[in-house]
Amino acid sequence: MRHRLQALAVLIAALIALLSPSCPTIVALSQGAPTPAFHHVHLNSLDPAAAMAFYTKTFDVTKKTNLAGLDAVQSDNMYLLFHKASTAPLIAPDSAIWHFGWGSTDMEADYKKHLAAGVSFHTPMTRLGSGTLFAYMKGPDGALVEINSSQTRAFIHVHLYSDAPLCAAEWYQKHLGAVSRATAPRTGPCEVPFAAPSEPLGVIRSPATTVKIGEVNLIIYPRQRPGPLVSTRGHVVDHIAVSYPDVAAALERLRKSGVKVLEELHRFGKGKAQAAMIEGPDSIAIELVGRE
């Protein structure tokens, strides 16, 4: 029944594309692909215990837990996992993962609270033209951790860089089953010239787009440096992970679609679930984790 419904969704998307006078670009989920959930952010750390203590102390929606025999920090339905690094992880903004962060229902109060608790900030509280307030914390091992205005205090986003943000969004939709947050269908090619940097902070903000996996937004901005982005492996944020009911089936589907496989099927941690690693747009490493 599930496969029949997914096939019907693909057919409907194709019909919409044919009937629309403006021929908007519609990205259909690969046939047979189940809906994913966001699973975890995997960090490299010189001192995982200290890093876990930072996150659980700083964000009251988190707690220390055990996941498949691995020490982890849980934030609602997602996790932070840690690999003990023998050398300091890379922190240069030259990979696809820029930062990650939580929401704040009262930015001014939370910012003052964090300052009073001794949290250091890379970027102080700043207001965007939209009125949104944000700030970047100096996290453990050089990680950049954002808090920003939101209706929730949950872990809400991972911010990415891309050589072609709109193309990357299409990849996440087609191959992983991400949902576009765009307010209107896009027309034309996905490769679009970058705009000039804008304030605040002199950031290149266009073209940009957002897709959602489970409860987490992947916000995709243009890369801020010349030259292609490098692999996320070895950086402070080593990779992100999504979960599927059947990892073996998901991996085979992706392989047939031409997606690069970095790690074949293996056991996830010390549990019964399977896992694998693929490479997504801009050399981002993405782990696939089975749902037990």
Regions found by a protein language model. Give the residues of each.
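Boundary of Sec targeting at the N-terminus
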Residues: 26-34
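N-terminal secretory signal peptides that target proteins for export/translocation
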Residues: 1-6
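Short, structured motif recognition centered on aromatic/hydrophobic residues
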Residues: 38-41, 80, 97, 145-147, ...
